[in-house]
């Protein structure tokens, strides 16, 4: 889709116009583990106080129905008010080791969105420059979100030990999450954890990286960006972390904003792709969600693509970034833009993001959850939607994979196909996305890429978003799955649906 960009940075709201920088504060590990349901299913979300105590017995939702808008019962802490969270050690194979900057990086100037009447209010205008030591304030002058930094599990490449002038400090390495009991049966490691860490992206941090040299190359080639291969090589073959350092070096050396200069030379899909590449990954997710809900209409598939596929640590950082940059509670926006079981699924997923994701699997709990799902669907007349919501929205991805395997043993049916028979619409798509990411995440993005290029026309925003966000995570596996499923390489599909500099950049990012 197309966005109407104001002058300067193309429509991407700048950080509130304060001068101080936003270094990550000392982080603390957030207690890890999943919610261990008590006998009878276990309530969800956590009990009063916002802690990680095992929830009491009883089903979800509570007897009085789902919680009213404004938050979960029992004192669930608000997202933005929490301290900074350290990324869980090891993550799920989502990117490079710690070293990525916080999402507050230099270069995003220009006024904020001009929201249509009746839509979202525009974020605070004004960009930000190379940050000195201090802290960015949140919208409206509130103190900055303490300790928020880009998690290692979503880092797009690791930076070197040195820092350019004006560069953001490196991320504090995440602490290993403390163990949380997973239920009555001993937790057992799962092969899924190893499979997740085996994924790889097409872009890796460039060796012998020189941010100032790259900034000079971009400045010299600015006029011929659409035809000169040098700037394409620089942008498409640097990690996200390295691109942030290039922006800082450009501003330090020339006193100009790289993004504004690029925008003056670019337009259309090339512009959208370049801006996406230069956005820090957490900010890009938050920005995409904001655009999916602002103004008239809602892009539900964007909500599904991001919220149903990200890890817990990624979700909580997206929630905090959304609040910091747009001055809005993402939960309130979701409640106002969605409804019914789809709304409850998304809200439950965000609640799951409060805790660190465990890589252990409780096999006894998986069997119990499989029985619960069978009794909620195939084993009764009608469908108990709340039971599906409880299991699929609150369990970790490794645990859900074990649930799917247990379900197949119990019913001799595939849980994905059962969801297709029991649900329809966006709730079906959302539940399937969660489960597919638990079983094999690259397959979900493979199918999304195929749909973005299927038929007449191309969904360029989806194509750009997936290629960019998965380029340092699992795009290699997505490409392999694509050719196996469709007997056509992803590069061939991109080549037949795009052209010019836009095509060359997409192919370069995808490792062609």
UniProtKB/Swiss-Prot annotation:
UniProt superkingdom: Eukaryota
GO molecular function: calcium ion binding; calcium-dependent phospholipid binding; phosphatidylserine binding
Region annotated Disordered, chain positions: 14-62, 146-190
Gene Ontology cellular component annotations, sorted alphabetically: cytoplasm; nucleus; plasma membrane; vesicle membrane
Annexin repeats by residue range: 209-279, 280-351, 364-436, 440-511
Biased composition, class Low complexity, residue ranges: 14-38, 164-182
Keyword annotations: Annexin, Calcium, Calcium/phospholipid-binding, Repeat
Biased composition (Gly residues): 39-52
Family: Belongs to the annexin family.
Purpose of the protein: Calcium/phospholipid-binding protein which promotes membrane fusion and is involved in exocytosis.
Swiss-Prot/TrEMBL domain comment: A pair of annexin repeats may form one binding site for calcium and phospholipid.
Protein's recorded name: Annexin A7
């Amino acid at each position: 889709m197309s966005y109407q960009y104001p002058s300067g940075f193309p429509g991407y709201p700048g950080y509130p116009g304060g001068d101080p920088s936003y270094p990550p504060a000392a982080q603390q590990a957030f207690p890890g583990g999943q919610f261990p349901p008590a006998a009878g299913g276990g309530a969800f979300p956590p009990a009063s106080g916002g802690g990680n105590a095992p929830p009491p017995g009883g089903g979800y939702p509570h007897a009085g129905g789902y919680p009213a808008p404004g938050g979960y019962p029992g004192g669930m802490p608000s997202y933005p008010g929490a301290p900074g969270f350290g990324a869980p050690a090891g993550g799920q194979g989502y990117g490079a080791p710690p070293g990525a900057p916080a999402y507050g990086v230099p270069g995003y100037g220009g006024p904020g969105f001009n929201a249509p009447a009746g839509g979202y209010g525009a974020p605070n205008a004004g960009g930000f420059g190379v940050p000195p030591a201090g802290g960015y304030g949140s919208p409206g002058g509130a103190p900055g979100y303490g300790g928020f930094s880009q998690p290692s599990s979503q880092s797009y490449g690791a930076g070197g030990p040195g820092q350019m002038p004006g560069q953001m400090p490196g991320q504090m390495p995440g602490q290993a999450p403390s163990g949380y009991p997973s239920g009555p049966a001993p937790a057992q490691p799962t092969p899924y954890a190893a499979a997740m860490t085996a994924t790889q992206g097409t872009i890796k941090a460039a060796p012998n990286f020189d941010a100032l040299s790259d900034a000079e190359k971009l400045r010299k080639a600015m006029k011929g960006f659409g035809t000169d291969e040098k700037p394409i090589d620089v942008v498409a073959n640097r990690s996200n972390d390295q691109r942030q350092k290039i922006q800082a070096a450009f501003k330090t050396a020339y006193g100009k904003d790289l993004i504004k200069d690029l925008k003056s030379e670019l337009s259309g899909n090339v512009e959208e792709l370049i801006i996406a590449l230069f956005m820090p990954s957490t900010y890009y997710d938050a920005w995409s969600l904001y655009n999916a809900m602002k103004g008239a209409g809602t892009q539900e598939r964007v909500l599904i693509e991001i919220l149903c596929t990200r890890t817990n640590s990624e979700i909580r950082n997206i929630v905090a970034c959304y609040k910091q940059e747009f001055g809005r509670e993402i939960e309130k926006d979701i409640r106002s833009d969605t409804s019914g079981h789809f709304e409850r699924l998304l809200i439950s997923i965000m609640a799951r993001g409060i805790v660190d994701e465990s890589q252990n699997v409780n096999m006894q709990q998986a069997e119990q959850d499989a029985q619960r799902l069978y009794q909620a669907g195939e084993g009764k007349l009608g469908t108990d939607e709340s039971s599906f919501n409880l299991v699929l929205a609150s369990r970790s991805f490794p645990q859900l994979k074990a649930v799917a395997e247990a379900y197949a043993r119990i019913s001799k049916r595939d849980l994905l196909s059962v969801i297709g028979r029991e649900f329809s619409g966006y709730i079906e798509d959302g539940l399937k996305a969660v489960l597919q990411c638990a079983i094999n995440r690259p397959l979900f993005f493979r199918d999304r890429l195929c749909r973005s290029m299927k038929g007449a026309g191309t969904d360029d925003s989806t194509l750009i978003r997936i290629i960019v966000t998965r380029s340092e995570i699992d795009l290699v596996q997505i490409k392999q799955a694509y050719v196996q499923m469709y007997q056509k390489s992803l590069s061939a599909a991109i080549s037949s649906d795009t052209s010019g500099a836009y095509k060359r950049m997409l192919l370069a990012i995808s490792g062609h």
